[in-house]
Amino acid sequence: ASDVYKRQVSGDMIGYWKYYPVESENGVNWGKVPVWGMADIVESKCNGVEVGERIYGFLSMSSEVIMRPGKMKAASFVDMAEHRKPLPELYNGYSRTEGEPALYKTLENERCLLFPLFITGYVLADFLADNDYWGAEQVLIGSVSSKTGFGMAAFLNSETNFSGKLVGLTSPGNKAFVESLGDCQPTHKKIAPSN
């Protein structure tokens, strides 16, 4: 919910309204709020996209979405609508769910909630690794109990060659959860008073 709210509030600044724009009324521009979700193809005029297919991707919170599929692959396609071409392809790609592991079908809600933010954690960790951590001996992750935060910690801990100290910040209520993940250095009770 907080991620959806962020998109609503920052739609103009970050460009989220550009994915599913709406004609302006009286000089006021509008947009449909995008979310990561699942959709069923109910009509298709595109060879290779069949009615009844289920897809996963960055969708509009609306009853229907019109796309221009391109870059077709067995497991995916990209929405090639003209207004989306300058936008990051990560948000324009759609996975076809038909050939995916059966487990994915049972975890659709979790996939929509967790995958995008966990992937963001991977991208952040990979960015640090690609830049050799700018020589840092310590990485501090704010809100390490968030989906992006613990994803980043997990990837820094297991997928990169970071040999420094990994420190995560969290609230007292999330301390046990963060410690159970085992990706950060031991946490402390408090680093500053909360008042």
Regions found by a protein language model. Give the residues of each.
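N-terminal basic, amphipathic alpha-helical segments
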Residues: 17, 25-29, 57, 61
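A glycine-/small-residue-rich N-terminal strand-loop-strand element
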Residues: 36-64
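Short, small-residue-biased leader/transition segments that mark boundaries at the very start
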Residues: 1-5
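NAD(P)H dinucleotide-binding glycine-rich loop of Rossmann-like/cofactor-binding domains
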Residues: 58-137
